[in-house]
C-alpha cells in the first residue's frame, strides 16, 4: 500500500505541482510531509496525518514549520 501512495505522491510532484506553483504555507511542503508521515507511521496513520495537514493548509493559515510527529512506541 505504501508503494502505491508513494507513486501517487511522486506523480503529483512531477506532473501537477509544477503547474500549480509553490503555494504551500508550511515547511516541509504538504507532499513532503505526506511522504514522511507515510514512511514513519505507515499507510493508514500517515494518510490520516497528511489529510489533517492538508486541511490546515489554506490562505488564512499562518503556516510555518510543521514537522511530522515522531512515532510513538507501541504498548505491550
From Swiss-Prot:
Cellular localization per UniProt: Cell inner membrane
Pfam families: YidD (PF01809)
Keywords, in A-Z order: Cell inner membrane, Cell membrane, Membrane
Keyword set includes Cell membrane: yes
Membrane topology listed for this record: Peripheral membrane protein
Keyword hit for Membrane: yes
Primary subcellular site in the record, as a coarse category: membrane
CC per GO annotation: plasma membrane
Cross-referenced InterPro entries: Membr_insert_effic_factor_YidD
Highest rank taxon of the organism: Bacteria
Its biological purpose: Could be involved in insertion of integral membrane proteins into the membrane.
Family designation: Belongs to the UPF0161 family.
Family matches, as HAMAP family: UPF0161_YidD
NCBIfam families reported for this sequence: membrane protein insertion efficiency factor YidD (TIGR00278)
Protein name: Putative membrane protein insertion efficiency factor
Amino acid at each position: 500500500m505504501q508503494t502505491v501512495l508513494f507513486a501517487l505522491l511522486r506523480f503529483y510532484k512531477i506532473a501537477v505541482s509544477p503547474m500549480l506553483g509553490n503555494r504551500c504555507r508550511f515547511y516541509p511542503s504538504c507532499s513532503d510531509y505526506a511522504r514522511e508521515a507515510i514512511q514513519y507511521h505507515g499507510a493508514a496513520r500517515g494518510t490520516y496525518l497528511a489529510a489533517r495537514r492538508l486541511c490546515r493548509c489554506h490562505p488564512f493559515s499562518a503556516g510555518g514549520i510543521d514537522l511530522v510527529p515522531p512515532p510513538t512506541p507501541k504498548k505491550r
